[in-house]
């Protein structure tokens, strides 16, 4: 049985994936054979050398433990691995686009992505992306080539999500950072404004995430024990309540495509302004024309899903030092929260 696992970080549907994640359960009748040979025979698009490189880098696990390429598979083994995606045909050109650099050294840079910017060239978005801006920023660094898959973005966030991303300048940095995402040792938290009030102050959402059979542009949530979708866990904590909407912090335990957006929709709290997941409907509040006009003004103030990648933490790939970064809320979300605070104050008068 072969189970294809989603990438390590949320991504927009109009961009390609950074990595290919796979999960394979070895059949009961399988005879012992080297894992590099076993995987090559099952993945027609992958060479044996590609599998060996992944194993050497620590990206091949059996029963949750890293193994080398000479490991011999056994019946019932659960194999998980991460492979670099074959490089795209699109040539990445350096473009003079403003870039908000939060931190930079010889090995990496942390950037604060604006909402509305695609992270990587893909179908319909060949220019104006974050990596085009990175290529310009690093144009005087001879060792960095934006077209080299061994450097560059380590993870992604959606086009209309703002916030922190880490970019690797060297192959070693990308390999070590990628391994941290693979092993789930990074820390990432998001701030979001969602519809409706919560009965509790914090909670945990567990549910597999896979393509919505009714809409291929959306993800849907399936039971945790289902064979459909990929395991996903989101933790949330209420930061501020506005009656009809709630400001929350979300912490990723996994990182599936549209994970926070799909999970919040699933528990009845769609992201405010998230058109794809029903967040542009007036889901809570009054029926008056005044209230409806107020909500429409809110949507205009923040014309996207109100989701921001607030914090990012990882171990530096060269120094071994813990690195933690925080990005302030962007202006559109800050103004949106202020508008709701003023609205609630008006109700209290």
Feature names for model-found ranges:
Residues 1-349:
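RNA pseudouridine synthases
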């Amino acid at each position: 049985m072969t189970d294809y696992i989603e990438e390590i970080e949320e991504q927009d549907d109009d961009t390609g994936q950074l990595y290919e994640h796979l999960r394979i359960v070895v059949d009961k009748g399988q005879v012992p054979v080297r894992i590099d040979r076993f995987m090559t025979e099952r993945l027609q698009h992958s060479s044996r050398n590609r599998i060996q490189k992944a194993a050497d880098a620590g990206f091949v696990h059996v029963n949750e433990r890293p193994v080398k390429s000479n490991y011999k598979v056994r019946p019932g083994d659960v194999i998980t691995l991460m492979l670099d995606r074959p490089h795209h045909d699109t040539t990445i050109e350096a473009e003079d686009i403003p870039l908000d650099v939060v931190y930079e050294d010889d090995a990496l840079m942390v950037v604060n992505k604006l909402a509305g910017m695609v992270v990587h060239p893909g179908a319909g978005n060949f220019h104006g992306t974050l990596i085009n801006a990175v290529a310009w920023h690093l144009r005087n660094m001879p060792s960095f080539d934006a077209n080299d898959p061994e450097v560059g973005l380590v993870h992604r966030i959606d086009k209309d999500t703002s916030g922190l991303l880490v970019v690797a300048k060297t192959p070693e940095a990308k390999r070590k950072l990628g391994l941290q995402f693979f092993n789930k040792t990074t820390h990432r938290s998001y701030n979001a404004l969602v519809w409706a009030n919560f009965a509790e102050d914090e909670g945990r959402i567990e549910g597999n995430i896979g393509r919505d059979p009714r809409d291929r542009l959306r993800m849907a949530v399936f039971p945790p024990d289902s064979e459909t979708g990929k395991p996903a866990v989101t933790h949330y904590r209420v930061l501020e309540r506005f009656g009809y909407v709630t400001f929350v912090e979300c912490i990723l335990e996994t990182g599936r495509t549209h994970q926070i957006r799909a999970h919040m929709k699933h528990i009845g709290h769609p992201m405010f302004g998230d058109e794809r997941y029903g967040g542009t409907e007036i889901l809570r509040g009054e029926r008056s024309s005044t209230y409806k006009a107020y909500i429409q003004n809110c949507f205009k103030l923040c014309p996207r899903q109100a989701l921001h990648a607030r914090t990012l933490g990882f171990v530096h790939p060269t120094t071994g030092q813990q690195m933690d970064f925080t990005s302030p809320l962007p202006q559109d979300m800050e103004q949106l929260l202020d508008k709701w605070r003023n609205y609630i104050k008006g109700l209290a008068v």
